Amino acid sequence: MFKHQAVLTGIACALAFATAAAHAADKPLKSIGITVGSLGNPYFVTIARGAEARAKQINPGAKVTAVSADYDLNKQFTQIDNFISAHVDMILLNAADPKAIEPAVKKAQAAGITVIAVDVAAAGANATVQTNNVKAGELACDFLAKKLGGKGNVIIENGPQVSAVVDRVNGCKTVLAKNPGIKLLSADQDGKGSREGGMNAMQGYLTRFPKLDGVFTINDPQAVGSDLAAKQLSRTGIVITSVDGAPDIETALKGNTLVQASSSQDPWAMAQQAVNVGYGIMNGQKPANPMILIEPALITRDNVKSYKGWSAPH
């Protein structure tokens, strides 16, 4: 049930297409540059590994270089410049700022490089492969609202303002707005997409709000950090939901934590699809739709044992 069946069927077709194209293509895939938000996040590590695995299926000698932008736009500009200087064939881009990154995207394309946005949109990219993040936010917050019986004090622990985070928050807000008994206390604190950031943001919330019933965090590292903060302050009875389906959240859902659900992503499949699409574009095969969405699935304490996870190849 967690195989993202419809999407994976499409990916299987794309794999077959790309493999066939590899035999006839007049432009080989020799190198890929990958720049992501943070290689301290296992999610982005999985993206890098998935992309490398697919690239080496196409060409065993392909060189794949992955770097961490740390959500720093200027740093990412420099990384893209370095990829251009290295004459990579393709860049997989997890943009620090989806709009401001456009000049770097255009510069890479002018150098003959195909740019595929991964996980978040990037202005000017040849194509984008990402989770349906609006749906991910909706799933997590629908669970949260139902768990609270449609009433209570809730916060949205925000994060870096990339398109994926904005979409998740918008999806969550849409669901919460349908529950008049739920009071949204705050949605503007940046948990920085990390465990430490989530813990710091949650400590502030717990100090500020003596009664807190539910928390939606924009990713799993923030959820784990928020749970740690609640433990440190001996706060119980809070429902935490998030997005990712990371290994740490599997552990949290099986243990004694406040985390109750996470909308899963599939970074391995996302990365493989991104390489497929980019390789096709390199050889004149543009996708029918440049925005490719992978549907999320909700993991809870009730079904986590059957969840296959995304840390292993598939």
What are these regions (language model features)?
Residues 2-8:
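Helix-enriched interaction subdomains in cytosolic or periplasmic regions
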Residues 3, 13, 19-314:
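A residue-level marker of the well-folded mature domains of exported/periplasmic proteins
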Residues 8-14:
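Sec-dependent N-terminal signal peptides
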